[in-house]
Amino acid sequence: MRSDLLPASGTYADIPIGEVLTEAGASIPETSLRLYAFYDAAEQAAVPTPPEERPIVLIEHALTGDGNAADWWADMVGVGKPIDTAKYLVLCANALGGCAGSTGPSSLHPEGGFWGSRFPGLSIRDLVQAEKQLLDVLEIPRVHVIIGASMGGARTLEWSLLYPEMMDAILPIAVSARASAWQIGIQSAQIRVIEADPLWHGGDYYEAGMGPVWGLGEARRIAHLTYRGELEVDERFGAEPQQGENPLGKFRSPDQRFSVEGYLDRQAMKLRNRFDAGSYVTLTDALNRHDLGRDRGGMNAALGNSTVPTMVCGIDTDILYPYHQQEHLSRNLGTFLGLSQITSPTGHDGFLIEARQMGNVLEKFLVTAEKLAKDPEQRANILQQHHH
């Protein structure tokens, strides 16, 4: 491992990974990924265990996430937390195509100007390929486990099929074997709204200094409803008016809102302030292209051929990736460790909200993964059970 390239614990480094060739045949030259690393000292220890002596946990973030996993998954990642940064070397990189430090549409193009509309379409496999190149640069031949939820879960599954020899076990959370027609439909509706913003300019708005933030906010309103639970949203807001407003007047007026509209307005504003529309379109399109079965004989064959021990986790009220999709993974995975259900009214976002349940699942998974790493025979046995 090139410890000299690792950022100090809790910080990031931008690591050049060279050219990335996409699954569809496009080239992204001079690419770099922003990598966060966490390897703290234990509370009693005077000095931390050096990172090169630790098992590696690779975390994959969701659509609008970034590499700072100790921030967006604060209950899970840290000293003494389920993913213990005093025990593991925890790595998390901003995805290719993102806008939190890695090369994406808002990055400068090597030939001048911004990438913008010149940035190619990406698949989930392309995001994994870029991360593989990152690990190659760091001279990390394998990791202990890979854990990811939502888009991160899609990358986790692709990692296990593209480079099965590089990990002991994986935990994909709240994801499916491929994008469903419903997901593609609602996600492409979000893309259309951004493209309909007059400031989109075909993706080339970076020079203008003003971007399609209206469209991005509207896309987030749609998306956010798919991240929550239907009953939870109704319980919180019902058909109540926004405080001091009247949505039942003589004429409909955009400043006379229902309470839930005010909530979605706040969610839209939060994302507008921290995310780029070009990255939103690129990564949402990558989710539309998610299909483990492509060029592998279909998704059930692809799952059946998986040789990486896999624990699956889902949320009972998930609208975006319904629990039956995790059950489907479980039935078909070649090397299956178990299926855990998080019970929550909050839907897809449950993996971020239900800290106690999520922590239990992670701890159970990491104990199992450690046993597998120590006892290769056990892994062989699991494989045998499934491939008889």
From Swiss-Prot:
It catalyses: L-homoserine + acetyl-CoA = O-acetyl-L-homoserine + CoA. GO terms for biological process: homoserine metabolic process; methionine biosynthetic process. Keywords: Acyltransferase, Amino-acid biosynthesis, Cytoplasm, Methionine biosynthesis, Transferase. Pathway: Amino-acid biosynthesis; L-methionine biosynthesis via de novo pathway; O-acetyl-L-homoserine from L-homoserine: step 1/1. Its EC number is 2.3.1.31. Pfam families: Abhydrolase_1. GO terms for molecular function: homoserine O-acetyltransferase activity. The keyword Acyltransferase applies. Residues 55-354 form the AB hydrolase-1 domain. It is found in: Cytoplasm. Homodimer. Belongs to the AB hydrolase superfamily. MetX family. This is Homoserine O-acetyltransferase. It comes from Corynebacterium urealyticum (strain ATCC 43042 / DSM 7109).
